[in-house]
């Protein structure tokens, strides 16, 4: 073997050749604007396809009196949040596929999967029905979870469904990184407990006041938990939003912020 070290330049002296401009300019699709008069026809009775409506922007106020939708226990993957299998035929119809919301999630109070108690009428039913009821009657709801919430495949529907059904906040001990970002993209406030043991303070029938009106990068969020017996608990939560992600939240979603 030669006794001398290989010789050569670590990087090209004149930099790398790039022809991005040529690529962009050669394809009208990169520079043209969509035709606002173009009509996409979807059968009104289609079960598979539904035109998406933009999510509403945040009104700038604290979230108050948010009812607890579900307190999940243990592992809660994206498949627990939005099951695949036969549900995939509805992936182009947000209203229909949202009926699988948290079907596999374990209710921390009962040990049942996908069934919760509606605090407005005491009925026990699927999570999506209660979420829809809270959205219509209370303006939204909150999900409380344990560690690594949203682990598994990075399916967007696991964030789009709760957003569609009015979930405003997900408060967890920790998040799977990609799902946390997906929640941010859909305009849901993703928070973690500063003290993970505060998870134990959450009781069935609780409502939440989330002080997010003054949200800034790196600042904690104060939460007041109201219990059915009239007592309260104060909880400090934290977030990982940067300036761009806060703009997503304010606009209602990342897409709306574009």
Where would I find each of the regions flagged by the language model?
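Fe-S-dependent hydro-lyases/dehydratases of central metabolism
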Residues: 1-258
């Amino acid at each position: 073997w030669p006794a001398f070290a290989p010789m050569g330049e670590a990087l090209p002296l004149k930099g790398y050749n790039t022809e991005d401009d040529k690529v962009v300019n050669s394809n009208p699709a990169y520079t043209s604007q969509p035709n606002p008069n173009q009509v996409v026809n979807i059968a009104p009775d289609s079960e598979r396809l539904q035109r998406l409506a933009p999510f509403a922007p945040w009104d700038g106020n604290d979230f108050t009196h948010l009812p607890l939708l579900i307190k999940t226990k243990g592992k809660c993957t994206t498949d627990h949040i939005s099951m695949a299998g036969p549900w995939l035929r509805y992936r182009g119809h947000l209203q229909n596929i949202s009926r699988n919301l948290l079907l596999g999630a374990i209710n921390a109070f009962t040990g049942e999967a996908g069934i919760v108690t509606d605090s407005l009428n005491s009925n026990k039913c699927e999570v999506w029905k209660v979420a829809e009821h809270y959205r219509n009657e209370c303006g939204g709801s909150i999900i409380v979870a344990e560690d690594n919430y949203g682990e598994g495949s990075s399916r967007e529907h696991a964030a789009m469904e709760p957003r569609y059904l009015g979930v405003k906040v997900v408060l967890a001990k920790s998040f799977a990184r990609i799902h946390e970002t997906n929640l941010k993209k859909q305009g849901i406030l993703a928070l973690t407990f500063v003290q993970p043991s505060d998870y134990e303070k959450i009781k069935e029938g609780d409502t939440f006041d989330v002080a997010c009106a003054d949200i800034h990068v790196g600042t904690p969020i104060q939460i007041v938990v109201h219990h059915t017996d009239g007592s309260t608990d104060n909880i400090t939560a934290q977030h990982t939003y940067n300036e761009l992600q806060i703009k997503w939240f304010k606009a209602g979603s990342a897409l709306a912020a574009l």
